[in-house]
Amino acid sequence: MHTTGDGLVVPENEQAYRSVVDRAGHGYLLRQIFVARAGHCTFTPAETITALHVRLNRLDTGHWNVPSPADLNAEAASLGALNVAPPAFTSYRPAPYLRPFDLPGEGRFLFG
């Protein structure tokens, strides 16, 4: 889970991470969820619990069933007092990671 307006650890890192996971052949294990908010890890408690439910469902069923942002927002909203701000799950595709990064153990640089 990542905020779209994170200036400390930019969301483009998620695109770089996906590239590494995909090249390792494990893309089927990775799901990325984004929250439309500024700041680093500025998730509400309700958003955090909702994302945890998605992960727990994956462990229980062996399958990813990531609901739409609207469904995630509805689940978070149902948690009442844990919403210190309106739920803000969103569809988001990070921009390409423009800096080369090294894939550990392979001694080569990758570009997103």
Stretches found by the model and what they are:
Residues 1-112:
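C-terminal His-loop and adjacent cap/lid subdomain of alpha/beta-hydrolase
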